Amino acid sequence: MNDNLKKKFEELIVDKRMASALCVTFGNENNDYFYCGGRLAEDDINKTNINSIFDLSSISKFFTLIIVFKVIELGMLSLDDTITDIDQRFINLNSITIGDLLSYQFELKTSERLEKCSNIEELEHLLFNVTFSQNKGIYSDIPAMIIRILIEKIMNEDFFSLIEKWIIKPCKLENTYINIPDDMLSNTVSNNFEHRIIKNRFITYDHITRGICNDGKSQVFKNIKFAGHAGIFSSISDMSKLCKKFLNYELLSKKNVFSLGINRTGEKINGNYTKFFGYLCYSKHPIRIYSEVNHQLSEKTIAFGGYTGNQLTIDPVNNIYIFMAANRCHNRVTQIIPKADSNKYIKMMNGSKTIQHQGITYIYTKDFVYARDENVIDPIVEYLLS
């Protein structure tokens, strides 16, 4: 790794102050590079290292995707099976296939917000009664949550047990959990003290202590079960191992690895593009600013973006992977609702968007994904393809 790359990474956390911690790994099926910058928390003197544990947020869907296609490869599931072929409790989804579900062919909705449920049973009751509409390409966590239930029914086994058996053990992962052991919390990155401005109220989320998933729906599972869409914690050392095994076709067949990222939703309608998704992942969008996938990469690339500041890109054609983990929620303002209120709060300071509250200056990280691409993803792609 050259010094120019390191400078770009450091700019994200030192100059732009988009997060207190940034860890990055990238490479191909044989070689890897690692970068660790910043501290585990702003009030923590300990620096990040390759084994520092991050909340993966929606990168957890990568694990879900691997398990689903492993079950397909075992001949126990087909993309053409309907949801109610497997589980008739999903009373409104009898015409939707597994392929439809995984590729966001329909918009799925619950009657109430899932994060407000008090327990897993209540949440699953809402999922069993989910309804759909003919809106293609609407991103949602619900498909991953539903497929988790279906796989458990098919295999008669807990989903995370399958992750342990088919991913964690063969990849020799050492820092990947849904429930982080107490003795490893001291090397876990903080996402606590996320701030949001909602209808002129400054709200602080101060209960996301180390080991608690940022995602509200996953919190319902209380680290006991995996929700399917979020809730896994891991490190760059583990994610590097996982990506290399994936690129070597040791987890899934080459045919399936090459099929996952193919666009199945995106199209141009009345001059505007819809969103581009593969199976539970982003696929390459024609317009870079809207694309989770770098434009120099292939049409077979899979990508995942995580709310807490993570990104995973794997291109099986160019044979490269990139994984970055950051804590862009930690002691930063992440959202202003309604968006129209943004201008009355945001002030530019040293090139960064900031917000003042009670004499304290906070960095506003709503635009994190653009800074992430500029400072991490795009420079790495240039480096790997050069």
Where are these regions (language model features)?
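Short, conserved catalytic-motif segment at the N-terminal edge
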Residues: 2-54, 76, 342
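Short Pro/Gly-enriched beta-strand edge/turn motifs at strand-loop
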Residues: 5-8, 292-299
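Residue-level preference for non-acidic, small/hydrophobic
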Residues: 9, 61-64, 68, 101, ...
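Short active-site loop at a secondary-structure junction
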Residues: 14-22, 44-101, 130-142, 227-230
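Short loop/turn microsegments at loop-to-beta-strand junctions
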Residues: 19-22, 158, 308-311
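Short, well-ordered beta-strand elements
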Residues: 33-35, 311-313, 318-328, 334
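Short, surface-exposed loop or secondary-structure junction motifs
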Residues: 93-296
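Short, gly/Ser/Thr-rich active-site loops of penicillin-recognizing serine hydrolases
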Residues: 248, 261-268, 286-288, 331-386
